Amino acid sequence: AYEQTAGGGQTTATDAEGNVTVYTYDDNYRTTKIEYPDGTFEERSYNTAGYLAGRLDRTGVETTYTYDGKGRVTQEKRQDGATRTYAYNTAGKMTQSTDYDGGKTGYTYDGQNRLTSVTDAEGGQTSYTYDEKNRLVAVKDANGNTTSYTYDGACVTSMTDGAGNTWNYTYDAMNRL
């Protein structure tokens, strides 16, 4: 069950066991605090552009966020000094992320800005293949396993995983699964 205060600044959610989670919002309806039934909480703050500026998680770890001029996150920095960074291409697609431990993940795209590969920090690569209608038709993971998809129009009609298992999907006249 959900209950909202008259001003809209706070909402409570009660689960089937009667546990209450309280959500608090600022004047722009952004979540500023979440209080959980176990007594832990999260807090969030925002910069003047409206982006998430800082977050205190349930374990007490504080993270601050830095953005570029286009509103994309370029850095997450924890209170212990560990950072996670992000780089983007001119089309706005992420090209690299560096995790808190320094591991780098690279992302490549084709001329239509479709993701074609992800290379993880250990060098494992996942590749993505599309058809002429820009539909994802295959994903090959770092272990060489390929999952393939077939379509009827925009609807996936089958998916076959790397072990050869196939799932078939049917839709009604309104394209509902």
Residue ranges of each PLM-predicted region?
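Extended charged/polar low-complexity repeat regions
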Residues: 1-177
